[in-house]
């Protein structure tokens, strides 16, 4: 089974990226708030895609860039955004099916296999 992350930003600036698989996937969503040493607050949403019949497991980590990078942002604001972001990711997952998770700009995707 091949799971790959296709970034369309070069072909379609502001377009979507997609996590696609040749067979259906089971996906789980998780989010966490990260406070950097410089005081920047960042919300990171993690999508884990697991094949139902293969051992190939990949994690796509997406970080919403710029949303919590201002001095006015704080942990409380980030906490209030978590349910909204998770709901959006859930809707995107359901709309596109378990085999394709679409991530709208400005989500910045990275994919890496788990050991």
Give residue spans per PLM region:
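N-terminal intrinsically disordered, cationic/polar leader segments
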Residues: 1-115
């Amino acid at each position: 089974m091949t799971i790959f992350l296709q970034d369309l930003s070069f072909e379609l600036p502001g377009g979507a990226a997609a996590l696609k698989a040749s067979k259906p996937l089971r996906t789980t969503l998780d989010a966490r708030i990260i406070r950097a040493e410089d005081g920047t607050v960042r919300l990171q949403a993690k999508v884990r895609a697991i094949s139902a019949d293969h051992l190939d497991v990949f994690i796509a980590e997406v970080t919403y860039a710029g949303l919590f990078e201002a001095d006015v942002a704080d942990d409380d604001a980030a906490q209030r955004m978590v349910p909204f972001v998770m709901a959006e990711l859930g809707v995107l997952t359901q709309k596109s099916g378990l085999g394709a998770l679409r991530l709208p700009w400005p989500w910045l995707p990275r994919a890496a296999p788990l050991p």
